[in-house]
Amino acid sequence: HPGTAISLAPVAYLLYQKVLQIDPHDPQWLGRDRFILSAGHSSLTQYVQLFLGGCGLELDDLKALRTWGSLTPGHPEYGHTDHVEITTGPLGQGIASATGFAYAQRFERGLFDPDTAPGESPFDHHVYVIAGDGDLQEGVSAEAASLAGHQELGNLVVLYDANQISIEDDVDIAFSEDVAARYESYGWHVQTVDFGESQQYVEDVDGLLNAITAAQQETGRPSLIVVKTIIGWPSPTKQNTGKIHGSALGADELALLKTAVGMNPEETFVVPPHVLDHTRALRERGQRLRSEWDQKFDMWAAQNPERKALLDRLLGGEVPDLEALLPDFSDVESMATRAASGQGINAL
């Protein structure tokens, strides 16, 4: 699935280098933003940025893409590759899961730090999603989007790669609705960044960054940013086709693409040291963000010792006197299974 990884490279680069609050050295940092690649089939979109940013992947890992035992399986897998927040692949599931992530963040914020001004709490973070046409076609994403709008999850930002191509070529054979209007009806904040707005295709990362900044400031509604792209651009003969969605470029097209972007078509897997030095400055940026967050967190912990103790217990997976919390059915002669299950779940 090279097409989306090629045309969304500037979008993913922008997220990792300029937007996401992450620490490459600590993928479990409590204060991190969460990134979910709902378009999990385009796993290279994320893997390349994890390599460039020094987040645990190296060039040999990219060479081992989609091979048994590698850190770069065909779809991102949670618990297998650092900085992958959740396993994705089934279309639409990533948007639905991200809604749950955003809901959980708001619950966490309300539990531990409800009175601090927005943006000032160590428990403030955003959930960012990259999704494609296939994700937006699925019913599960529609249901989740409806819930996210109803719950006013302003910490959720979805970047929708609207390239209008699927593995069956143009999506107009099955998908022609006004997605922006649909999400507006769900109660979302909707913006559009069109890379093809002018006569010449321009990867308008500045416009996209402005849209993301506006989404971050929209605290009462989830945000959808419709990014209109050409899949596989600037691949000379396969861009904007279903072939580049799910099939390898092939040696001839790859050589043409490298030539088009000023690379040596005879070289493979070459990343100039100065490029890596630049992108891996993400590590220093992450440490700076982490240091600033640590100060906020330490101040919160000093002012809220009981809440800090609760946080430590929850992070440690400790449930005090669990058996005493569970309902006792020893004297019950008859009860519907669903009722007993409900009592047990509610107690937990």
What is the predicted function of each stretch?
Residues H1-V127, T192, L276-L348:
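Thiamine diphosphate
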Residues I22-D26, R32, H80, V84-A281:
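Glycine-rich ThDP/TPP pyrophosphate-binding loop and its adjacent helix/strand module
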